[in-house]
Curated annotation (Swiss-Prot):
Miscellaneous information on this protein: Heme 1 (or BL or b562) is low-potential and absorbs at about 562 nm, and heme 2 (or BH or b566) is high-potential and absorbs at about 566 nm.
Main location as per UniProt: mitochondrion
Amino-acid positions noted as binding heme b b566 in the UniProt annotation, renumbered to this chain: 97, 196
GO BP annotation list: mitochondrial electron transport, ubiquinol to cytochrome c
Highest taxon above the source species: Eukaryota
Keywords: Electron transport, Heme, Iron, Membrane, Metal-binding, Mitochondrion, Mitochondrion inner membrane, Respiratory chain, Transmembrane, Transmembrane helix, Transport, Ubiquinone
Transmembrane segments: 33-53, 77-98, 113-133, 178-198, 226-246, 288-308, 320-340, 347-367
Protein name as annotated: Cytochrome b
Biological source species: Eliurus grandidieri (Grandidier's tufted-tailed rat)
């Protein structure tokens, strides 16, 4: 008798995606982060749902409702901090996942890669709107500053900003619509993630060597289910440590002050996972130029398949490109640090240099390194 998982219309899809999926036998732990992102998304939707049961999206009660969740709701503090720090874990996994794709040349599966970029933008939009909801000082001013960037769009900018705000400033209408969008977007992320997986399973997973692995595949279950579960346990351990020992480590103290339109915080900054893009935005004195640089800092990823010059897909056997890759990682860490610093000397100059280096490595140095390495191989 044929197993039900191979015949049932629904179970058949699950079987082909997570059980009998032919997987390269040599993929390392860097391939764990896709499943960890799935776990993070489930956690965020679950905790977010329970938070939404007690949250009120009104400017007069939003801050108080978050305080009420932490003080009066059973384990409300745990749900709130799991949700806030879960977002940080989500972005750590996202950055590693994208970084792994860049290192091992996974971007050569263009549909999967482009779907991933759309997912990245959607998750970033979701996180930004979620940060506005507690209605603290940084929520309010962050929303004001970031939405106001759209006014840099020629001709329609100001009208567009007022349309998004639902008035002439960030107010009740803005908070209500941000809550509505923050609630719906994670479900859109789930749908996009399914399309992302659909495209991935058309071509199959890449592997560290960057070579075709059709001749050497193993079933996903039990080999990689067990491997993924280890990753999940480590993720939960790290998240639990953060939530139970240092829940406010990654937050901003200003957000414990209720939003006040009459009092601007000395230094407005977004959550830590947006600081690299914020630093790139601030490094350009022109408003429109800054907005374009901000968008391009993520959109530049879409150019990677077209900038690939090497005959090898992965960086595994390419020391020159490896060096550039790790300089890029260090550069992103510098940008993250700069994004959290005040706009003054020497931080302005460091930010500008780091921003130039970021785009130069991706657009010029990496393609050049690929060609140089190919020529060295020809000479050998």
């Amino acid at each position: 008798m044929t197993n039900i998982r191979k015949t049932h219309p629904l179970l058949k899809i699950v079987n082909h995606s997570f059980i009998d999926l032919p997987t390269p036998s040599n993929i390392s732990s860097w391939w764990n982060f896709g499943s960890l992102l799935g776990i993070c998304l489930i956690l965020q939707i679950a905790t977010g749902l329970f938070l939404a049961m007690h949250y009120t999206s009104d400017t007069t009660t939003a801050f108080s409702s978050v305080t009420h969740i932490c003080r009066d709701v059973n384990y409300g503090w745990l749900i709130r901090y799991l949700h806030a720090n879960g977002a940080s874990m989500f972005f750590i996994c996202l950055f590693i996942h994208v970084g792994r794709g860049m290192y091992y040349g996974s971007y050569m599966s263009i549909e999967t890669w482009n779907m991933g970029i759309i997912l990245l933008f959607t998750v970033m939009a979701t996180a930004f709107m979620g940060y506005v909801l507690p209605w603290g000082q940084m929520s309010f001013w962050g929303a004001t500053v970031i939405t106001n960037l759209l006014s840099a769009i020629p001709y329609i900018g100001t009208t567009l900003v007022e349309w998004i705000w639902g008035g002439f400033s960030v107010d009740k209408a803005t908070l209500t619509r941000f809550f509505a969008f923050h609630f719906i977007l994670p479900f859109i992320v789930v749908a996009l993630a399914m399309v992302h997986l659909l495209f991935l399973h058309e071509t199959g997973s890449n592997n560290p060597s960057g070579l075709n692995s059709d001749a050497d595949k193993i079933p996903f279950h039990p080999y990689y289910t067990v491997k993924d579960i280890l990753g999940v346990f480590l993720l939960i351990l790290f998240l639990a440590s953060l939530v139970l020992f240092a829940p406010d480590l990654l937050g901003d103290p200003d957000n414990y002050t209720p939003a006040n339109p009459l009092n601007t915080p000395p230094h407005i900054k977004p959550e830590w996972y947006f600081l690299f893009a914020y630093a790139i935005l601030r490094s350009i004195p022109n408003k429109l130029g800054g907005v374009l640089a901000l968008i391009l800092s993520i959109l530049v990823l879409a150019l990677l398949p077209h900038l690939h010059t090497s005959k090898q897909q992965s960086l595994m056997f390419r020391p020159l490109s490896q060096t550039l890759y790790w300089i890029l990682v260090a550069d992103l860490l510098v940008l993250t640090w700069i994004g959290g610093q005040p706009v003054e000397y020497p931080f302005i100059v460091i930010g500008q240099l780091a921003s130039i280096l970021y785009f130069t490595i991706i657009l010029i140095f990496m393609p050049m390194a690929g060609m140089i390495e190919d020529n060295i191989l020809k000479m050998a």
